[in-house]
């Protein structure tokens, strides 16, 4: 086992703080509408230029073992805030830095870290309540567009996201893909999309786009492999007599069954497409059942006594259109009963509430989105690959940001909500001793995001903070224009969830810093001595 380094008390905490400061100082220059960019060197390929806090944080690796741990703890704040809300990473980092700086100063002066932590937690809880009181529900498409525009730093992206959410609903899927042209495109699929394409390219009906488009098809949904023609032909004959195309979604289609479909497609006698079922094991069963409910069909499986050769037309699903590419399938306007779909949606929601696994929750949410909403695809194009990656990442963040706004409402942006919520919160907060000192640490820390936004925009941070304290709630500095205005009217807004998550996650990590009494780190290994002699005595190799 490798040797360890151990540091105690002040030495331990200061080591962590140095690491945190290096990371936070690199990240906080990006805050606000006038935030600067940071260039990230890559081992391979061109460097990346970004102003996304979490991307910058991920790149920072420090040499000193204690500093490295400090930086990693703050990375966790940024990552957690990004995962939950899609934005607010830089705000969370700035808050964490301010809380730790003020907290460690008080610990060094003799304050009890546990008392400080209790005070910090009490103040954060009160401010979170005040944020909820200040919050307004998202009522218009324009508000969604404003929120997403601020996150992405581009009004056009905001408009496209608002349009997409308007079409697919708050639980609908909005995906971001790389487009083939400059600018943005929005495609809508009012149905279900999953990541499995046709088994054979011979099924393509549009050879230019290499996709299969079938209008008003029957859909055979089978939780089994289909390889034997004897059991499969009765189904094909019934569909052929009905004069409709056939979509087969099964564990696999192979052998003579696949040959029959391909040969008839090439001859033009019968349009069809075979698709492998999405997922594995129990998840595949559940997804096939989702497809069956959406299309009004049944899952053909011997587990429930349904055999392929006995399948009738009324057991097959229906849809207005099915589009299949080599990678994905989109079912548009399934013929399923609305009440059955609603029942299935409620069932999945209940499962989401019950599960403890993050992975299961994510997969259940994907299933919920496929059933409850449609699918919107935003295609982004750019001049260079570096620009394209950065733009795609910004759009993905902005989508999560817009969904957070719909979920919990919106607040005045620009760091103003935290400051104004804290003024109201501290009027009602009665603490004593070290707890009161802990609360005062939070009071000073919540000024930092506004201060940093002002500094990045070229203003004097302290002056701006004092000015905003004297203004009515909702009035603050619009750093893009340099004017003090009604931020809701100007569209300078942040999702409540983003601001709340940033504060709570920052306070959580600050508490860990303050109550740390020892740090145990890996001892850096010395580089191995070079055994080869400097002079090889004229030897040839």
From Swiss-Prot:
Q: Which GO terms describe its biological process?
A: protein refolding
Catalysed reaction equations from the record: ATP + H2O + a folded polypeptide = ADP + phosphate + an unfolded polypeptide
Decide whether keyword Signal is in the record: no
* EC nos: 5.6.1.7
UniProt keywords, alphabetically:
ATP-binding, Chaperone, Cytoplasm, Isomerase, Nucleotide-binding
Highest taxon above the source species = Bacteria
- Please give one Gene Ontology molecular function term for this protein: unfolded protein binding
> Which Gene3D superfamilies does this entry report, sorted A to Z?
GroEL (3.50.7.10), GroEL-like equatorial domain (1.10.560.10), TCP-1-like chaperonin intermediate domain (3.30.260.10)
This protein's GO cellular component annotations are:
cytoplasm
SUPFAM superfamilies in the record: GroEL apical domain-like, GroEL equatorial domain-like, GroEL-intermediate domain like
Positions bound to ATP: 30-33, 87-91, 414, 478-480, 494
The entry's localization annotation reads: Cytoplasm
> According to the UniProt record, what class of enzyme is this?
isomerase
Which InterPro entries does the annotation name? Chaperonin_Cpn60_CS (IPR018370), Cpn60/GroEL (IPR001844), Cpn60/GroEL/TCP-1 (IPR002423), GroEL-like_apical_dom_sf (IPR027409), GROEL-like_equatorial_sf (IPR027413), TCP-1-like_intermed_sf (IPR027410)
Q: Which family would the database say this protein is a member of?
A: Belongs to the chaperonin (HSP60) family.
Known partners and oligomeric status: Forms a cylinder of 14 subunits composed of two heptameric rings stacked back-to-back. Interacts with the co-chaperonin GroES.
What the protein does comes down to: Together with its co-chaperonin GroES, plays an essential role in assisting protein folding. The GroEL-GroES system forms a nano-cage that allows encapsulation of the non-native substrate proteins and provides a physical environment optimized to promote and accelerate protein folding.
Please identify the protein, giving its name as recorded: Chaperonin GroEL 1
In its UniProt entry, the species of origin is given as: Thermobifida fusca (strain YX)
Q: Which gene encodes it?
A: groEL1
């Amino acid at each position: 086992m490798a040797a360890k380094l151990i540091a105690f008390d002040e030495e331990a905490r200061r080591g962590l703080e140095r690491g945190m400061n290096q990371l936070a100082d690199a990240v906080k220059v990006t805050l606000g509408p006038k935030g600067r960019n940071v260039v990230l060197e890559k081992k391979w390929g061109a460097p990346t230029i970004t102003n996304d806090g979490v991307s910058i944080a991920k790149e920072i690796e420090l040499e000193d073992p204690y500093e490295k741990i400090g930086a990693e703890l703050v990375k966790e704040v940024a990552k957690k805030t990004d995962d939950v809300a899609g934005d607010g990473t830089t705000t969370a980092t700035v808050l964490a830095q301010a809380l730790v700086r003020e907290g460690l100063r008080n610990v060094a002066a003799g304050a009890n870290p546990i008392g400080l932590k209790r005070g910090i937690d009490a103040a954060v809880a009160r401010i979170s309540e005040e944020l909820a009181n200040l919050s307004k529900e998202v009522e218009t498409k324009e508000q969604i567009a404003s929120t997403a525009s601020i996150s992405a730093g581009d009004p056009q992206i905001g408009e496209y996201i608002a349009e997409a959410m308007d079409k697919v609903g708050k639980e609908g899927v909005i995906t971001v893909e790389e487009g083939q042209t400059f600018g943005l495109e929005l495609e809508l699929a009012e149905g279900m999309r999953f990541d499995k394409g046709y088994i054979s390219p011979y099924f393509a009906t549009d050879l230019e786009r290499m996709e299969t488009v079938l209008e008003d098809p029957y859909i055979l949904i089978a939780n089994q492999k289909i390889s034997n023609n004897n059991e499969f032909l009765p189904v094909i004959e019934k569909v052929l007599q009905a004069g409709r195309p056939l979509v087969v979604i099964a564990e696999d289609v192979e052998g003579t069954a696949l040959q029959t479909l391909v040969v008839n497609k090439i001859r033009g006698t019968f349009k069809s497409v075979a698709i492998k079922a999405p997922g594995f094991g129990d998840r595949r069963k559940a997804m096939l059942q989702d497809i069956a409910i959406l299309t009004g069909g049944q899952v053909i499986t011997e587990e429930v006594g349904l055999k392929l050769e006995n399948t009738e037309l009324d057991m097959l699903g229906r849809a207005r259109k099915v589009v299949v590419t080599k990678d994905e399938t989109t079912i548009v306007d399934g013929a399923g009963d609305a009440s059955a779909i609603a029942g299935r949606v409620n069932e999945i929601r209940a499962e989401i509430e019950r599960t403890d696994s993050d992975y299961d929750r994510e997969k259940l949410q994907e299933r919920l989105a496929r059933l409850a909403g449609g699918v919107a695809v935003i295609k982004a194009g750019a001049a260079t690959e570096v620009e394209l990656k950065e733009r795609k990442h910004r759009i993905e963040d902005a989508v999560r940001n817009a969904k957070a706004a719909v979920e919990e409402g919106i607040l005045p942006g620009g760091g103003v909500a935290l400051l104004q919520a804290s003024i109201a919160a501290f009027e009602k907060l009665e603490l004593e001793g070290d707890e009161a000192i802990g609360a005062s640490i939070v009071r000073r820390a919540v000024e930092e995001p506004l201060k940093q936004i002002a500094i990045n925009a070229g203003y004097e941070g302290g002056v701006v903070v004092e000015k905003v304290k004297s203004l009515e709630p909702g009035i603050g500095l619009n750093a893009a224009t340099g004017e003090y205005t009604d931020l809701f009217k100007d569209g300078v807004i942040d999702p409540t969830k983003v601001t709340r998550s940033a504060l709570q996650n920052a306070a959580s990590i600050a508490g860990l810093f303050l109550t740390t009494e020892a740090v145990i780190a890996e001892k850096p290994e010395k580089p191995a001595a070079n055994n080869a002699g400097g002079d090889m005595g004229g030897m040839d190799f």
